[in-house]
């Protein structure tokens, strides 16, 4: 059986570029454990240029091949691609649209599901339509006096708020606000990251995460894991990835009643199926002191860095990551 030429595409144009490279390391190591794949790692930079790990400039053409700037190098045909890109253009659905156009099979959620989940406003509309509880919010489409007034009213009503750029990941463009004098500046900053902004009520709760993925034709939801931060610490980009971070994770959250855990998993599967996700996701919830469950967000290409929860939860559930990738890829190619 001939090997599969697999393009591992990483990087991208968002603030999560470097995190995507770390995740790609995990994918590359996992794929190397199988003899089925010829893997070519290509970095997409912030200017849309492609370069191999060896430093060769190249491009992905509509003939489903990698063509090198050095014309003495033969083109490399691509059978399958893993778009290991957090943020734009990976989780936004943009690059998936291009893969669809050139009929190149790819790993992960399709373009519409990616776009719907990445935009926090669209996602919350879907959560509500599916009957899944989520945090109270308002959304804003421009930075003006009315937006400032609405946000200040929300702060007065809720006591504490989060202001979030609607289309960013990893807590980029996300701010906790307790002081009305900071509202205008925070809104201005958030609108610098995205044309739409969402304002959410601050929820004092545990942060639980579920890995949801397809395995041998079934949608699997793991037991919830937990992100544990210092008291009153917001899980910022730096808290997630900085060496000085004091946050820690439990692959299986402790002291969660069985019925609550099962309800969280049921909501996670309902969101996965209802929003037509594919292959993998990480679905994040809040659990309040009163055991109220609130869906926070869906990540359609969860991180796979050394500290990331998705691969840990998958493995804790009894599944090998390399075998999981092989099953997905071979199943998809066989169905062509």
From Swiss-Prot:
Name of the gene this protein is made from:
ddl
The family assignment reads: Belongs to the D-alanine--D-alanine ligase family.
Q: Does the keyword Ribosomal protein apply?
A: no
Q: What is this protein called?
A: D-alanine--D-alanine ligase
Gene3D superfamilies of this UniProt entry? Answer: 3.40.50.20, ATP-grasp fold, A domain, ATP-grasp fold, B domain
The record lists the organism as Shewanella sp. (strain ANA-3)
Cellular localisation: Cytoplasm
Q: What pathway, per the record?
A: Cell wall biogenesis; peptidoglycan biosynthesis
Assigned keywords, A-Z: ATP-binding, Cell shape, Cell wall biogenesis/degradation, Cytoplasm, Ligase, Magnesium, Manganese, Metal-binding, Nucleotide-binding, Peptidoglycan synthesis
Q: What does this protein do?
A: Cell wall formation.
**EC numbers for this chain:** 6.3.2.4
Q: Where is the ATP-grasp domain?
A: 124-330
Give the binding site residues for Mg(2+) 1. Answer: 284, 297
Q: Where does Mg(2+) 2 bind?
A: 297, 299
Q: Which reaction does it catalyse?
A: 2 D-alanine + ATP = D-alanyl-D-alanine + ADP + phosphate + H(+)
Cysteines paired by S-S bonds: none
GO cellular component terms, A-Z:
cytosol
Keyword Transcription regulation in the entry? The reply is: no
**Origin superkingdom:** Bacteria
Give the UniProt record's GO annotations in the biological process aspect: cell wall organization; peptidoglycan biosynthetic process; regulation of cell shape
| Residues that span the membrane, as ranges | none
State the free-text cofactor note: Binds 2 magnesium or manganese ions per subunit.
Q: Which residue positions does the secretion signal occupy? A: none
- Residues binding ATP: 154-209
């Amino acid at each position: 059986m001939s090997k599969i030429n697999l393009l591992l595409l990483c990087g991208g144009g968002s603030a999560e570029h470097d995190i995507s490279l770390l995740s790609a390391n995990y994918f590359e190591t996992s794929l190397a454990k199988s003899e089925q794949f010829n893997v070519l790692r290509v970095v997409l930079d912030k200017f849309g240029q492609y370069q191999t790990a060896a430093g060769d400039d190249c491009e992905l053409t509509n003939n489903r091949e990698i063509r090198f700037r050095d014309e003495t190098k033969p083109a490399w045909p691509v059978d399958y691609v893993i778009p290991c890109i957090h943020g734009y253009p990976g989780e936004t659905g943009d690059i998936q649209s291009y893969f669809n156009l050139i009929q190149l099979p790819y790993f992960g959620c399709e373009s519409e599901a990616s776009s719907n989940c990445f935009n926090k406003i669209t996602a919350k509309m879907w959560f509500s339509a599916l009957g899944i509880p989520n945090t109270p919010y308002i959304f804003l489409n421009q930075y003006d006096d009315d937006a400032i007034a609405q946000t200040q009213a929300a702060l007065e009503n809720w006591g504490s708020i989060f202001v979030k750029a609607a289309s960013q990941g990893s807590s980029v463009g996300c701010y906790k606000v307790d002081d009305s004098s900071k509202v205008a500046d925070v809104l201005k900053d958030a609108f610098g990251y995205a044309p739409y902004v969402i304002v959410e009520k601050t929820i004092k709760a545990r942060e639980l995460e579920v890995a949801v993925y397809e395995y041998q034709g079934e949608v699997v939801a793991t037991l919830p894991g937990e992100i544990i931060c210092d008291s009153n610490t917001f899980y910022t980009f730096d808290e997630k990835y900085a060496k000085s971070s004091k946050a820690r994770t439990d692959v299986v959250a402790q002291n969660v009643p069985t019925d609550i855990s099962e309800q969280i998993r049921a909501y996670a599967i309902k969101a996965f199926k209802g929003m037509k996700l594919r292959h993998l996701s990480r679905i994040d919830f809040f659990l309040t002191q009163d055991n109220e469950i609130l869906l926070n967000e869906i990540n359609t290409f969860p991180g796979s860095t050394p500290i990331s929860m998705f691969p840990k939860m998958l493995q804790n559930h009894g599944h090998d990551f390399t075998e999981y990738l092989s099953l997905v890829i071979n199943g998809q190619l066989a169905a062509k």
